[in-house]
Structures are given as C-alpha cells and as structure tokens.
Amino acid sequence: MLLTQIVPRSLFDFYTTSIMDFKLDSQYAPTGDQPQAIDQLVHGVDDGAPAQTLLGVTGSGKTFTMANVIARVNRPTLILSHNKTLAAQLYSEFKQIFPENSVQYFVSYYDYYQPEAYIPSSDKYIEKDLMINEEIDRLRLATTSALLSGRRDVIVVSSVSCLYGIGNPEDFNESVIDLHVGDRISRNEFLRSLVNALYSRTELALERGQFRVKGDTVDIRLAYEDIALRITFWGDEVESIQALHPIEMYSFGKHDSFKIYPANIFVTSPLRQASAVAQIQLDLGREVENFRNEGKELEAQRLYERVTYDVEMIKEVGHCSGIENYSRYFDGREPGMRPFCLLDYFPDDFLTIIDESHVTVPQIRAMYGGDLSRKTNLVQYGFRLQAAVDNRPLKFDEFERLTPQTIYVSATPADYELSRSEGIVVEQVIRPTGLLDPKITVHPSENQIDHLMEEIQLRTERGERTLVTTLTKRMAEELNDYFCRMDIRTAYIHSDVDTMDRIRILDDLRAGVYDVLIGVNLLREGLDLPEVSLVAILDADKEGFLRNHRSLTQTVGRAARNLNGEVIMYADRITESMQRTIDETERRRKIQMQYNKEHNITPKAIVKPRTSIVGMDAETADVPQFEAAPAYRQQPAAAKDRRGKQQHQPRAYVDPSPSQQQVADPVLAFMNREQLKKHIERLREQMICAAKDMEFIEAARLRDEIIRLELSEQSITE
C-alpha cells in the first residue's frame, strides 16, 4: 500500500524525508504575457539576480506566474504578504496548485495582544496580556517542522511575523525525536525526550502537545498536526509505531520510523538553560549597580526583584512570564546581535517573493523602530534588563542580507523595488481571460449614498457583489449600520476584525451571504473576488495615503476580475492621482482590446471555486447560506467590538475597589449570572479593541474589571 494511502495527505509532509520536486497541478497552461514573464524571472534567478520586479495588473495571473517560477527553479520559497487575510488567500491558492508538496502558513498567532509597556508621564506600568489562537500556533509549528524535515519542496506563505524572533533552529533540530522500530531505548528515557521537546504529560483526553502513558504504551498528540501517535515498547525496545486519529484513536497504519518535532518553537536544552540563568544573574548585578551609581535606587530595586523572580521561575518550571525578553541568553547571542527568525530555518539558496511589495516593503522597514521605542522605556526605568532590546524584529538591512534573491510582485511597484531591481522589471499586463480593466466613472459626492444604493441594487439583481471603500473605520461601520437598516445584506472588514473572522466574511461574500462588503485599506491589495462587479470609492478626491495613485489603482483592480467590472469614484473634483489612475486604466484597456482583437478572444468571466482556507471548509449548499444571512448581518463579528469600544475614551489607569465599582455601576447588582456573563464578554471585546488601537491603559483597566467580575460571578444567584 502506498504511504499516502495509509495516512492523511497533510501528515505525509512530516515523516517523508525524500527530496521531492515541485509538482504543479493545474488544468491551465501559461498564456498571454505569462510565458514571457516566467522565462524572464526564471533566467534571472538562475543567473543569480539579487532582485527582480514583476509588474502585473490585477487579473493577469500573477499568482500562477509565481507558481510556475517556483516549480521551475525548484527551491524552497518564502512568499511574504503584508496582512493575514491576503496571506490566507495565497496559502489556499498554493495548496491547490501544489497538492503534493509542502505548503505552509506562518502568521502571528495572537488573537489579542497587549504588549508590556511603561508610560513615564503618568508613571503607569502595563503588564503584557495576550490570547493565542491554537490553530495558527499549530500551523506555525508545522512550518518550522517542514523546513527542518530535509524536504526541498516547501513553500511558506507568511506575514511580517517571520521577521520576529523565534527559537534557535539548532536547538529546535536537536530536540527532534527520530524514532525507529527496533531502537534500543527505555520507555522512561523516551518520556524524558518528550518532556525536553516541551510535550506535557496528562492522564485525561489528549490535547495538542500532550502525551499519555499506560504501561508500555505511550500515546502522543502531535503539536504541529491533527494526528496522534502510539508508541509501544517491549522492554527497552520500540516494538511498533502507529499513526492514530486524534479523537477516535483508530489506526491510520503502522510505520517503521517517525520524526517527532518539538511542541513549541521556543525550545532549548537544559545545558543552555543553565548557562542562560548564570549570564542573566551576572548582567543583573552589573545593571543594578549602574542604577545605584546613578542614584536610581527605585529602578535598581525594581529590576532586582523582577529579574530575581523570573530566574527562580525559570529554574523551577523552565519558563516565566515575558521569557522572550531573555531570548538573547537562551540563543547564546552577543549583545546587539539580531534574533533568530523564520528565515534562519530556510536553506541558504531559498527564494523570496514579496507580494504587493509597494505595501509590504514599507511595513518591513517600520517593524524595528516601533518595537525599540517601547522597549527603551522598559529598560530605562528598571522593568527589564538591557537584553530585552535584543528581543526584536529584524532591521531592514538585516532582512535584505538574509534574502539573497527576491522577486517583488505588484501592480504598482514603488521606487525602492524599481531601483533595487536595476531595471529588471517584467511586465504582465495581458489577461488570459480577455477581461478588460473596469470602466471608471466620476460621480458628484452630493447624494452619493442614495446613488450608491441604486447601483448596489442593480448588481444584486444580477447576482453580483459590491465593494465600498471609505476613509476611516468609523465611516465603514456607520455605513454598514445604515445599509443594514435599509435591508442591504452587508458586512465590513478592517484591522479590528479578527483574522479568522475576516476570512469567513470574505468567503460569505463570495457565497452570497452578503451582497456588499465595506472596508478601508484592506480592500486595496490582492483580494481575489471574481463575483465583485462594482467598486465604489467614497471621497476619492481626498488626497492622501488611501487616495494616492497607487492606492486608487489597486482599489480599481478589485473590479478587474468580473466581466461587468465598473468603478465609481465619488468626488467633486478630479485630482492628479485620480487622473493618473483613469489614464493608466484606459491605457491598459486599449492594450487588452488590441490583444483580444489579434487573437480573436472574447472576454469571459473568471469562474473560481470556493475552497477551504486555513482549515475551514467552504460551504457548498446554495439556499441555506441565504437563510442565515439576516441574523448574521445584524451583528457581524467586529461591529459589536467597535460599538462597545467607542463608548470609552483613553484615561488614566486606576484600580477601583469592588465597593467603588458597585456604586459607579449599580445595574450590576441586579444582574443574574447569565446577564453578567454577557456583560463580561462585552468588556472582553472592548479590551481587545482598545489593545489593537494602542490604548493600553484603557485595555488594562478593562482587563482588571473583567477579572473582578469573574471572581464575583460565583456569588450571584440566578
């Protein structure tokens, strides 16, 4: 029986160590500008060109071109996207194109993250608080495991999260357990290896990253894949290795060998831990003495108490809160050295593709500065050792050195990409489908909403979708509320909407649950929505970041995948950016029309199947999705977050006593347990929004209120 017949396809990635070639699976062949673009890019990579730029219009098949380049150069590849939503879309597409190869997804695993901070002006310290998405954590582990498995056919789709520090790849690799049937190893020795790989023991139902022992049988729930293993011992010998269903525990088959990768990216050896603790204590003594020499007794005492407590926690349980601030010691790095990151897990000859580079590159540049300003305060006021500054994202020049060969992909490349490519710019302006760029019309802003609703109604009657882009998140939410009252099936997405919720909303738009999607800058780059025939740009004449030539061109491109594509710019004057966008769009329309005429092509709509994104299956039924729309529409995931959050303004952090709070909010005294739970949930949503808006004092206040209410919940009777 074939190996792939025994176990799920995804598991095959992790115990096959054979070097495989990329196998592109597509019913289409490159056409239009694609063959020429693919050849030029492949030749550039083979000739060692450090940077190239693919200038491809929306709908010209840039993703398919990228896939063909990857298949031909046959190297491990990092595809970098500037937000999680587009990264998820690319991940889904590459999983389809390369079903037999290892395609991985690596983004930030925080659903909510409030960083540690100190505000000197008000003498307020805010402790770190976070919520981790377990599914994304699993996908991150799967990424590092695949890269260290020895396979060459690995594609990683990532956000800028790949710039942040993770564990030393040498330590991670040393903690991999390479098990073979017949190995001479005692059960207890094997259990110690699991603990060193950060798996934890349980006697209950297996959760991810746990193991259970019954006699000579050890069951393990892998941390990086939805699979369980059963290792059976006969004395001091491994008798059998089975892959099991993680819940039902039925067998997928037996295996002669299996590699078990660590349960956490931040893994280290006991020897390195002891060395790190010793160095932390040395630096602590030196920095405390420096504070005292400067007459800063408060800072000296604060630093001594905090670090001493952390050291004791590390000695006793192996970790502490904020252990990432000591990563330099555990990694064995010198002061000032860059942290290890995902790029260190790739082989030396990997290829980097930066999607929507005109946005992604500036984002990469900005990562280091924002992190440094926050850490500097923590160090200066005795909350952290100097080493905390070295727990940081990569600087831009460090990123450039770690990515020897890069392809920038954008419909509107910026000056940096063009200059670094030194004239190696590959144009892809022909759409194989024959689709033309959308028509652009300019409409006065007076009565723009009434006019827009009429246009939406026309598209809805044809079964088409509409995108509306506003200047602010608040405008998006208020317009969403108004459309809901007008019985328009609508939703919105922006930075306050959780990653998985964004993906669901986009899928629901394609499915017909919504007819309209409202957003801000998330509607500009890369969204692949062939059902969208109308893009409405409100306040198009308000010059700025969201209404410059590049942004407008990208927004116009969202309607370029539909046969009836049209863009309406609502404005009272035509700005220079608007005119450039209109002229460039018209130029591309003429090129496409000439190509269609020469090749006798009739434009045809893109038919793109809805598929699973990041483990979530797309619905296939038609009618039930429409039936569920009204209830879902009234409270989309982020709407209640923002409504709740807007009720609070930033204020100084206080820690009121329970009695003070009861006087301030007497309604709580009359709540039953169910009502209190709902109130706590609303506060939690407000806390998440406050943290995302960098209002850390407000988020900390809400966090403490939630803790107090949870403690008092038990005393409230029904």
Where are these regions (language model features)?
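ASCE RecA-like P-loop NTPase motor cores
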Residues: Y15-T611, G615-A618
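Acidic, low-complexity intrinsically disordered tails
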Residues: T4-I6, S10-M20, H599-E685, C689, ...
